Amino acid sequence: MLSFLKAPANAPLITDKHEVDARYRYWRRHILITIWLGYALFYFTRKSFNAAAPEILASGILTRSDIGLLATLFYITYGVSKFVSGIVSDRSNARYFMGIGLIATGVVNILFGFSTSLWAFALLWALNAFFQGFGSPVCARLLTAWYSRTERGGWWALWNTAHNVGGALIPLVMAAVALHYGWRVGMMVAGLLAIGVGMVLCWRLRDRPQAIGLPPVGDWRHDALEVAQQQEGAGLSRKEILAKYVLLNPYIWLLSLCYVLVYVVRAAINDWGNLYMSETLGVDLVTANTAVSMFELGGFIGALVAGWGSDKLFNGNRGPMNLIFAAGILLSVGSLWLMPFASYVMQAACFFTTGFFVFGPQMLIGMAAAECSHKEAAGAATGFVGLFAYLGASLSGWPLAKVLEIWHWTGFFAVIAIAAGISALLLLPFLNAQAPRETHEA
């Protein structure tokens, strides 16, 4: 590994309590802002193609099946990259690993705007998926390193809103730019923004607290649950930690299976929602994308409620809140599907409620994976469940396009409603577990 990409060594420990407190407060705030901004732009360059899809479809460059194929290719590549990058990021310098990944996705988005053939689109979008995997595992590692167990839900939820801000803005920006200059210019604008923010990441981000002379966060906050996780698995090699706390951890596997189904719903609404609005209500691209943006707005609020609730109502136990939100997904998807009349306002409201409930488990499952694993394997654990999440998301691409061709929108909503129902059942074992990892170890 290039020397600047290696995780920095521990710096001499600062002994002055006031300086430790001041540095912790400063860097916790700045790191959260930086990873939030960075991940919003990762999401911006991830969803740029989806936002432009109706315009590309109308131009005749790609068919509906082609768009579904590209979505499936992206999700599979991204899922694999997320897992591999999670393992690598646990040993890498966070600031450069995440920053370089974002710059690379920006370059790929710009090149996509110059492309004309399906093969070029497929190659570039797979390459974009690969570099997209550099983002989320780094964020999970930093959130685990800088925020302790009993407060992490709220902070993780704040970071998670970057998904929603990026996801809500890109349809609006893409639609506005495409309306005046074409979808190709929209892809280039997204790419240029990503390159600029990627440079900011390389400048402002930092690695774990020990790298700048601070004690571990559990010691600083006197958080017993956090200290217990910090001390667990002492003396194990990285390979042993990966095997014991990730690959052979039954709770990680259960969370992974649930993530598959949650992401079927999330990706289906995200990727096909604007087309559904265009075809069923006959609205234009800007109006359709505005409704899809309500999905992200609902997710913004839902993630905050889920994180706050799991901290304050259930003392850091993610299980009960996960189950409540999974049941809400089923109800909101059913409302969107079975609405007895065509109303743009009501459809947009259903997009909002679906987003509200989807982004609870979307955020909490990743956090639960980090907390069910080892402190030094947070990136690998979230990357592993992320692999399964995007295998689920890949089902919303080409396979769901085929469902649409045969059974139309009725089949589409039946599939995602079933996925929502099963996901709720898979979360039942976590309902009464304060710390599934500790139960497993006992």
Curated annotation (Swiss-Prot):
Residues 52-66, 119-121, 184, 266-289, 344-347, 401-410 are periplasmic. It is found in: Cell inner membrane. GO terms for cellular component: plasma membrane. The chain crosses the membrane at residues 31-51, 67-87, 96-118, 122-144, 163-183, 185-205, 245-265, 290-310, 323-343, 348-368, 380-400, 411-431. Keywords: Cell inner membrane, Cell membrane, Membrane, Transmembrane, Transmembrane helix. It is a multi-pass membrane protein. PROSITE patterns: GLPT, MFS. Its main location: membrane. Signal peptide: none annotated. Residues 1-30, 88-95, 145-162, 206-244, 311-322, 369-379, 432-442 are cytoplasmic. One of its GO terms (biological process) is glucose-6-phosphate transport. GO terms for molecular function: glucose 6-phosphate:phosphate antiporter activity. Part of the UhpABC signaling cascade that controls the expression of the hexose phosphate transporter UhpT. UhpC senses external glucose-6-phosphate and interacts with the histidine kinase UhpB, leading to the stimulation of the autokinase activity of UhpB. Belongs to the major facilitator superfamily. Organophosphate:Pi antiporter (OPA) (TC 2.A.1.4) family. This is Membrane sensor protein UhpC. It comes from Salmonella typhimurium (strain LT2 / SGSC1412 / ATCC 700720).
